[in-house]
Amino acid sequence: MKRLLVVGMSTVLLVIGLPAHAAIKAGANCPTIGAKKISGDKEFTCKKSGSKLVWNKGVVVKSKAVLFSDFKKSKLKEDLTFSNLGKNYAYVPYLAWAKSGEKIVKFEPTNLKLTILVGPNTDPINKSPNTAVNLVSKMYGDYTQASEFVLVYYNFEDIAWAEKLVDEYIGKNGGYDTSGDVKKLCPSRNNCNSAGALTNSVTGIGLTMVTASDQERKNPIFFSGTLEAHEYSHTIQKKQYFGRMPPGLAPPQWLTEGGAEFIQTASVHYQSFDKYLTDRNKVTEYLYSFKDFTNSRLDAFLNPSKLGTNWDLWKGYDGFRVYDIGFMVSEILVAIKGPNSIMEIFKLMGDGVSFQDSFYKVFGVQWDSAISSITQVLADQLS
């Protein structure tokens, strides 16, 4: 009401106030040749075009990398967008963490049947996995989830036992031949430290296999709940499209794994931003250490041709890149639009919508435009 009153009383006041706040557009009139002004992530220069003075197309301003200690612990005074992402990147972790925590507090866990099965020779590292699973369930309490979630804990001695359970709960309805998955996660007694999520397309049951050799008992991944949270995130992702998505479509692997990596961290540590940052640092430390992810390399990784069609697009990369780079992109998306944004893409693709069109439906911005901003901002941090 107050702003409308000012407009009605004095057009002059409005005109004077615009240059300080309005976004600059290429080709718009500018004051003097050589004048420069930053708008969004670009610096524009005033140039002469014919008889007019106009702003040029602008150049992207390279931002300084944000140090771990420089991340803000407060909300932004303006809405975060892809256009102002560069200058506000220091706020991204807190915004993503806070928006996720708000959903966890708001929702109750879904009416989930949690079944925990432990092999006869197995001593599970995490004795209370239900805590982490319930936090993820609450974060996505407004999404359809599995009718039952089965956690199967086993070690090398219990492989045959675990194989029977996978056959019982999943059988031939896992979307691919899952008969070798149990051994693949635990090929030897001392190489048994992984997990994998499966979903039965007929019953809707989600099953996660969890293994861990004795040397992993002090590894936080196996006792903090983040592993179970990660795998249950996959179960929710799959529930949005499994058995419905048309052939030729597949959510990007970096969104699938990076999204789950973000969800596990934000859910388990929803009460402590400092703990969230600590785990975030562990996930992304390789990227920050090597500093070799340029804009072009990131674009090739995140936006290959045929994006949204299959996972073979990432076979040529180190396997963890879909986790750490995917985490950083998912964090940006959640900071801008909340945790539902990354889950809604799976749901829309289940309806037969391409990844690019799904992205536009969720964010109201074309994917090619958004990824240009994302890769530039991440390159500022990682190159």
In which residue ranges do the predicted regions lie?
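Acidic/His/Gly-enriched intrinsically disordered linker/tail segments
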Residues: M245-D324, I336, F346-S383
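Stable alpha-helical elements in mature extracytoplasmic
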Residues: I125-A132, V136, S224, E228, ...
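Zinc-dependent metallopeptidase catalytic helix centered on the HExxH motif
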Residues: P187-F293
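A generic secondary-structure signal for well-formed alpha-helical elements
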Residues: V12, Y140, I236-Q240, I263, ...
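Non-catalytic architectural context of zinc metalloproteases
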Residues: K62-R217, I221-T226, Q366-I371
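Secretory targeting and sorting signals
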Residues: M1-A22
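Tryptophan-rich substrate-binding surfaces of secreted polymer-degrading and adhesive proteins
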Residues: A22-K62
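Short, basic/low-complexity N-terminal boundary segments at the transition from targeting/disordered tails
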Residues: L18-N29, N84-A90
